[in-house]
Structure formats: C-alpha cells, structure tokens
C-alpha cells in the first residue's frame, strides 16, 4: 500500500514510475496518460474515413474495453443508427440482423488482441452475410487480415483504459460526435490531473480507495463498472461496483461532452486507487479462467450445457446466508431484451439487506468477471439462464451461437464453483 504524499504520488505517476504500484510492468501500460493529444492528431484521418462511406447503420462488434465506452456514448448522445453487439445470444444477434440492411451497414470489429472469441464469432457471422468491415486492433493482430480499413490502437493502453483511444474515438466519429470537442475536454482534465492541489483525479482516487461497495448508476456506470472492478478486484481485495446499495459514484455530466473529462478523471482516479490499495490496476490475472473453461467445453463437444440447474430451494438457501457486508450478483446469460425480467431476482436479493449487482453475460465476463474470481469473497452469485433461443451457425465452426453462449455460462459457473465461490444456477 502506497505511503507517498499526495503530491509525490501524482508526480511519480506522471514519471511512469512502476514502484507507485507493485514495481512490475505497470510502466508499460500508461499510454492512456498521453492519448488525448495523440488522438487529436488522428481526427482528420478518422473523419475522412467515416465521411467517405455511404451506409445507413454502423454496428460495433466488440467486448469489454472495446465496446463499453462506445455503448456509453451511444446512449448519452442518443445515436440511434449506431449499434453495439456485445452478446453471443442468438436471439439478440438475429434481432439486430433483422433491424438493419447488412449491405448498407458498416461493421466495426474491435479487439486489441484480435482473438476475442465473441468478436471473432460475430465477425465471421456478418462477413458471411456480406457486410462491409473496418477493424480496430493492435499491431500484429490476426484481425487486421480481415479488412483493408484497419485502425491500429496504442499497444501501451489496456482495453479498459482505451475510451479516449481509437477504440472509442472512431466509433464516436461514426456517431457524428464532435470528437475535437470531446478530446479538448479530456485534455483539460489531463492538465487538471497534474495539479498538486485541487487535482480531480487524485481526489476521486483517494475516495475510491476507501470505498468497499461503489454504487454505479446511469449510462456511464456501465463503463465505470468495468474500469473499477477489473482494475482493483484481485488478490482477495477490490472495490465492488453494485447497482443497489453502496456509496454513490461521483459522476459529473452537465452536458454530454463532459464524457471526455470523466473518462480521463476516472482512469486517473483508478490508477491512484490502485496505488493506495497496493495492487497493479493494469492486469487481470483471473480473467482467462472462465475463457479456458469455455474453450474446453466447446472442444469436448460432449454434454449439452444448460441442463444443470439448481432447485429453487438452492436460491433460497444462498440468499438466506447473505449478510450486510456481502453483495449479491445476478449473472444473467439471457437475451438482453429480457433484462427487465430479472427484477424479481433483484428484489429478492435486496430483501436480504445486501448490495446487489446485475451483469449480462457474456458482457460481464470482460467487466466484473475478474472481480468475481479474484476479488473479496463477499459475493453471492445467482446465475440466470434462458433457453438461449434458436441456434445460429457460426461459419467455420462445428458449433453455433446457442452452444457458444451455453458453454460460456456453464464455464463461468464451474469456474466460480471451483474457486469456492457461493453460486446457484436458475432458469429464467
């Protein structure tokens, strides 16, 4: 845990000193500190590309850090013809496909590694339908081979810190957002986060480090949830974002363009909180466990996932064990359009007096999944599944989206159970 004076902590962060955190590879992941100015230099390139295409809709295919900032901007700026697909549920994919003219749509496949299972599956599906593609990825990624329109990210920026990089700014341009104005606001906050006194990022980070349960609300909460949970939830510790209960998150959005400031303020604050908590806020050591389990299930081609459901009594027993220090996480592998149907589970969880979080799968695997496995053992997990709808074939694979999401759900269930987490599985 850092014992540096606040002014020295700020100075050392800007000096890229990894000893501020754990002294390992943190200095390799600080490209976000300078990204607002770098992106200003790329604006003309991005605007020229978007203005040169004639489409009716834009669909972003991505997960986690590659999709959540665009999703927040889509909601805040009310970009009706911009869509984010961050699910593998076949019903949701089919509904999106039926709502657009694929040949009049630009698909943006976004993945830093280029190997994200969900993004590659979605990309293969819509490329087979004849859609036009652009790619956002890091240098050396296999995804770059799929399009002539490739926009490379900065390799020294992790996914959850990439809101103000090309992963956020190209989608913003395609929504018609004035990205110069957005980046100018971010640059103003960047300068504010250099101050020794009255530093907005430092002040927020110090408060975060003293927070156990952080209530995230509204559209911006989706992005905060990933940033905070994945950055701090490790080594048995972490700040737990919740929907009901907890201390309210400090979010300032008097107008939509304040998103530029807030993205940077929260990134800097999370880095500060990581230092004060004595953790590396830029790694995610437990994320791959559920991915590995999913891949093993897909490879086995044995049992059909989705049949191992707990009796109703199991849910009652789980919730009866909740204490005010715990949180209940509703982990729902369901069609996102059915999210309102989760409310009865939320109300039952609230009745225990514990804080409540809700995550849609597989989105949450790239968001709060790290916290669930590596964070404090105060979570009670209720995995909710539906019947996954009618299947859609994934080109080049022996399985379709129905099997994929079923394996993702079962893979996460088994990973949490194997780690001794308290979890039950119920049908919606």
List the predicted regions and their residue ranges.
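C-terminal amphipathic alpha-helical interaction region
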Residues: 320-325, 360-362, 402, 407, ...
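Low-complexity, highly charged intrinsically disordered N-terminal segments
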Residues: 1-58, 68
């Amino acid at each position: 845990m850092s014992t540096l004076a606040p002014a020295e902590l700020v100075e050392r962060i800007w000096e890229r000193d990894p000893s501020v955190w754990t002294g390992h590879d943190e200095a390799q992941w600080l490209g976000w500190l300078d990204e607002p100015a770098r992106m200003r230099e790329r604006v003309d390139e991005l605007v020229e590309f978007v203005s040169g295409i004639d489409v009716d809709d834009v669909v972003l295919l991505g997960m986690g850090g590659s999709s959540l900032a665009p999703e927040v901007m889509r909601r805040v700026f009310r970009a009706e013809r911009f869509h984010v697909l961050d699910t593998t549920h076949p019903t949701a994919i089919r509904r999106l496909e039926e709502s657009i003219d694929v040949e009049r749509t630009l698909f943006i496949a976004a993945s830093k590694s280029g190997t994200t299972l969900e993004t590659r599956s979605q990309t293969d599906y819509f490329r087979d339908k004849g859609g036009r593609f652009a790619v956002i990825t890091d240098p050396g990624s296999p995804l770059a081979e799929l399009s002539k329109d490739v926009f490379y990210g900065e390799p020294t920026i992790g996914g959850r810190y990439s809101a103000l990089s090309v992963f956020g700014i190209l989608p913003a341009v395609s929504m018609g957002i004035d990205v110069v104005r957005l980046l100018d606001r971010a640059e103003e906050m960047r300068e504010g986060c250099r101050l020794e006194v009255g530093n907005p990022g430092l002040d927020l980070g110090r408060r975060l480090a003293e927070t156990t349960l952080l209530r995230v609300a509204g559209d911006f909460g989706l992005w905060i949830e990933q940033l905070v949970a994945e950055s701090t939830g490790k080594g048995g510790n972490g700040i737990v974002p919740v929907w009901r209960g907890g201390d309210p998150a400090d979010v300032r959005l008097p107008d939509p363009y304040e998103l530029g400031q807030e993205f940077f303020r929260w990134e800097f604050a999370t880095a500060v909180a990581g230092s004060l908590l004595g953790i590396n806020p830029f790694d995610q050591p437990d994320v791959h466990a559920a991915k590995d389990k999913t891949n093993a299930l897909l490879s086995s081609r044995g049992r059909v996932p989705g049949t191992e459901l707990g009796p109703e009594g199991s849910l009652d027993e789980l919730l009866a064990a909740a204490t005010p220090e715990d949180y209940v996480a509703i982990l729902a592998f369901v069609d996102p359009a059915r999210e309102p149907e989760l409310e009865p589970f939320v109300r039952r969880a609230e009745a225990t007096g514990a804080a409540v979080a809700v995550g849609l799968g597989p989105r949450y695997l790239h968001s709060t999944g790290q916290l669930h496995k590596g964070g404090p053992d105060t979570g009670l997990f209720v995995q909710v599944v539906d019947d996954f709808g009618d299947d859609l074939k994934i080109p080049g694979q022996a399985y379709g989206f129905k099997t994929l999401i079923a394996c993702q759900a079962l893979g996460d269930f088994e990973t949490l159970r194997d780690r001794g987490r308290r979890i039950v599985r119920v049908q919606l």
